[in-house]
Design a protein with these regions (language model features):
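Positively charged, low-complexity intrinsically disordered leader regions
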Residues: 1-24
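Substrate-binding N-lobe of the ribokinase-like
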Residues: 28-86
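Short beta-strand scaffold segments in enzyme catalytic cores
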Residues: 45, 90-92, 226-230
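Conserved phosphate-binding/catalytic loop of the ribokinase/pfkB sugar-kinase fold
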Residues: 92-128
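C-terminal domain-closing interface element
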Residues: 93-95, 99, 274, 295-318
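Short beta-strands and strand-loop turn motifs
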Residues: 102-104, 129-136, 164, 182-185
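Conserved phosphate/ATP/ADP-binding segment of small-molecule kinases
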Residues: 145-233
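Conserved post-catalytic alpha-helical subdomain immediately downstream of the catalytic base
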Residues: 213-224, 239-303
Length: 318
C-alpha cells in the first residue's frame, strides 16, 4: 500500500485556548499551539503515525514552513515552490465547552500554471499510489475544477480517490467519481442546501447524489452528534463516544485517514469502514491543537447502528 495526498493551500493553525469567549471583552490565554497544517498534510501525518507509507504533494512557500515541517517529521514530500508566506488560521478553542471558532485566511493568490504543476506532480506518483486523497481549500487563482482534473488523472491510472471538500470544488470533483466523499455537517449544507440528519429521508437524498455520480461511499461527520456513512445499498450511523475533547480541528482529517486505510485494505463493508474512520477521529479529539491519531486509535471502540438497508429502506419505498 502507498498513499498520496495533495495540499494546495497549506497553513499554520494557531490554536488559542481560553476558558470561554465573551465577545467585546479581553481574555486571558491559557495556551497557544502552532501546527503546520492542511487537509492533505494532516492525513499524511495520520497515516504515517499509523505506519503507512505516504507521499505528500504540497505547495512550499518562500518562508520555508513546508520544507521545515517535512524534514522535521522525516516524511516523503514533493514540494512545489511558490512565492509568499503560508497563510495563518486562528482557532479559538474554549476549554470549558469544547467549542472552537475559526478565522481562516484565503492564502496567497497564485497563477493557474501552479495548479498545472501540482497536477503534473501527482501524475508522476500515481503509478505507485494505492489511494489518492484530495481535500481542503485551494488558493485564490486556482480553478474550481482543480480536484476534478486530479480525479480524472486518478481514473486514468485506476487509482481510487477520496474527496474531502465543499462548494464548487466538491460539486465539480464529484464528476470524476471519487470512491468516497466526506463533507462535514456545515460543508454539506453549504454545498447541497440540505441539513444532514440521522433520518432515513436524509440518507435517501444523499444516496441519490451518490448514485447520480457513481460514488461508492458518502460520509458526513456530524461533530458531537457522531457520523454517517451512506452507500447505494445501506447507511450506518456511529454514535458519539464520550472522550476528553482537547482539540477538534484534526478529527475530520483523522477520519479521512481511517477511510483511506480501510479502502486501501480493500475493505468494502460499510460498518467496518465507518468504525475504522471514527476510531481515528476519536483518538485525535483527545489531542490538543491540530494533531492526528496515533497508532493506539485502532484500540478505540465505536458504537455503530444500521440506520437503513436496501431491505428495510430502499428508494422504491420512499
Amino acid at each position: 500500500m502507498h498513499f498520496t495526498t495533495v495540499t494546495a493551500n497549506p497553513c499554520i493553525d494557531r490554536t488559542i485556548q481560553v476558558d470561554s469567549v465573551n465577545l467585546g471583552h479581553s481574555h486571558r490565554i491559557q495556551k497557544t499551539i502552532c501546527d503546520f497544517s492542511g487537509k492533505g498534510i494532516n492525513v499524511s501525518l495520520a497515516l504515517t503515525q499509523l505506519g503507512m507509507p505516504v507521499k505528500s504533494v504540497c505547495l512550499s512557500h518562500s518562508d520555508g514552513e513546508a520544507a521545515n515541517f517535512f524534514k522535521q517529521k522525516d516524511m516523503d514530500a514533493e514540494l512545489i515552490p511558490v512565492p509568499g508566506n503560508v497563510r495563518i488560521n486562528i482557532k479559538l478553542f474554549e476549554t470549558s465547552t469544547g467549542c472552537m471558532t475559526e478565522f481562516n485566511e484565503k492564502g496567497t493568490p497564485l497563477e493557474r500554471e501552479t495548479a498545472a504543476d501540482v497536477i503534473r506532480a501527482v501524475k508522476n506518483v500515481l503509478p505507485t499510489t494505492s489511494v489518492l486523497i484530495l481535500g481542503g481549500s485551494v488558493p485564490p487563482g486556482f480553478p474550481d475544477d482543480f480536484y476534478y482534473e486530479l480525479g480524472k488523472c486518478a481514473q486514468e491510472y485506476d487509482v481510487p480517490f477520496i474527496l474531502d471538500a465543499s462548494g464548487s470544488l466538491l460539486v465539480n470533483g464529484m464528476e470524476a467519481a471519487p470512491v468516497l466523499i466526506k463533507p462535514n455537517e456545515e460543508e454539506y449544507y453549504a454545498t447541497f442546501g440540505v441539513h444532514p440528519s440521522i433520518t432515513q429521508e436524509f440518507c435517501a437524498s444523499y444516496r441519490q447524489i451518490l448514485m447520480e455520480h457513481n460514488i461508492a461511499y458518502g460520509a458526513v461527520s456530524l461533530g458531537e452528534k457522531g457520523a454517517l456513512l451512506v452507500t447505494p445499498e445501506a447507511a450506518w450511523y456511529s454514535e458519539p463516544v464520550s472522550v476528553d475533547v482537547k482539540g477538534v480541528q484534526g478529527a475530520g482529517d483523522s477520519m479521512v485517514s481511517g477511510f483511506a486505510y480501510a479502502i486501501a485494505k480493500q475493505c468494502t463493508q460499510g460498518d467496518q469502514l465507518l468504525k475504522t474512520a471514527v476510531s481515528c477521529a476519536h483518538a485525535s479529539l483527545e489531542l490538543p491543537g491540530t494533531q492526528m491519531c496515533p497508532w493506539q486509535a485502532w484500540k478505540k471502540d465505536s458504537r455503530l447502528h444500521l440506520l437503513s438497508s436496501s431491505v428495510r429502506f430502499s428508494m422504491g419505498q420512499i
